[in-house]
Amino acid sequence: MPQQWLPPIYWDGDAVAILDQRLLPQREAVIRCTSPKQVVAAIKNMAIRGAPAVGVAGAMALALGAVLIQAADARTFKSKFARLCRQVRTARPTGRNLGWAVDRIHALVEGNRDADVPRLHELIRREADLILAEDVAGNVAIGSWGKTVIPRGAGIMTYCNAGALATADYGTAVGVIRAAFDADPGIRVFSCETRPFLQGARLTVYELMKAGIPVTLITDNSIGSLMSRGMIDVVVVGADRIAANGDTANKIGTYMAAVLACTHGIPFYVAAPRSTIDASLPDGDGIPIEQRAPKEVTHFNGRRVAPQGAAALNAAFDVTPNKYITGIITEVGILSKPFGRAIRQALKA
């Protein structure tokens, strides 16, 4: 049976409330942010994560910060607001949605030349709310499109967490799973644990169980074995940034899963809103890859598991070349190869 759900981010009066995903699934605790600096900190320390959710958080941080700016006139306000936009934009580098949301609100402010400061406050808050609402509606549409590629009784594998916790609600890849399950409760879902931060084990399994959808947790290094045994029929993952040719940055290990899926003839789909597409990048070579602290690899639950002094690489993302991707599921339809042309058309829709 579905359980009560706490959204990952929402307004709590004049504060931004963020569900602390670092504590899940053991504890549900909310961080109440009263300044944009607190929201940025929550993004950086991964209390909130997932490209669409981070984009929404960035928009809400701007709305929160706008009313704190002391400015006697619109010109002064816009100058200070531009500085705030730069601070929020750089919170995490790989995901496209944060920069997209910040640029969208900044352009709105710059485009309203006759608005006074109170009016600008109103416009910023309204746009942040619209970004949140659009994300949820887009995710539901992604799910509706995505369920059409899921065979009846299929074994679906997903990686990391591209669910309600990674968005404003409902989810992208997990949104496809939700919609597929509603249409066919006979599907089987496999969630990779996703080391080292264990987003699959901690978050995807948590929210699927909350939704009443049966799920089996698997180790990352069992993907090939399960595929070879015919247990996986389709793979659906999310995305943090998609280049103009369809190359896709997602959680580290996605590339490995895509290669294995291709080897075994298994369809591999990326589910993401158009706001994740970065048309300024011709291919995945230009996608910035966030490097996180080695301690996330050398320690587990605060305890060292590697020898003292051991070196560790901890790239948070990798890039899957478009040749391994069967299709990109967006809110306006499923994009097929050649992705360059399909992406250009989707961005015009």
UniProtKB/Swiss-Prot annotation:
Catalytic center residues: D240
Top-rank taxon, per record: Bacteria
A single GO molecular function term of this UniProt record: S-methyl-5-thioribose-1-phosphate isomerase activity
The reaction(s) this protein catalyses: 5-(methylsulfanyl)-alpha-D-ribose 1-phosphate = 5-(methylsulfanyl)-D-ribulose 1-phosphate
Annotated pathway: Amino-acid biosynthesis; L-methionine biosynthesis via salvage pathway; L-methionine from S-methyl-5-thio-alpha-D-ribose 1-phosphate: step 1/6
InterPro entries (UniProt xref): IF-2B-related, IF-M1Pi, IF_2B-like_C, Initiation_fac_2B_a/b/d, M1Pi_N, NagB/RpiA_transferase-like
GO biological process: L-methionine salvage from methylthioadenosine
Keywords tagged on the record: Amino-acid biosynthesis, Isomerase, Methionine biosynthesis
A Pfam entry, by short name: IF-2B
E.C. number: 5.3.1.23
Record-listed substrate binding positions: R49, G50, A51, R92, Q199, N250, K251
Site (Transition state stabilizer): C160
NCBIfam families: eIF-2B_rel, PRK05720.1, salvage_mtnA
Function of the protein: Catalyzes the interconversion of methylthioribose-1-phosphate (MTR-1-P) into methylthioribulose-1-phosphate (MTRu-1-P).
Similarity comment: Belongs to the eIF-2B alpha/beta/delta subunits family. MtnA subfamily.
Protein name: Methylthioribose-1-phosphate isomerase
Organism: Syntrophobacter fumaroxidans (strain DSM 10017 / MPOB)
Name of encoding gene: mtnA
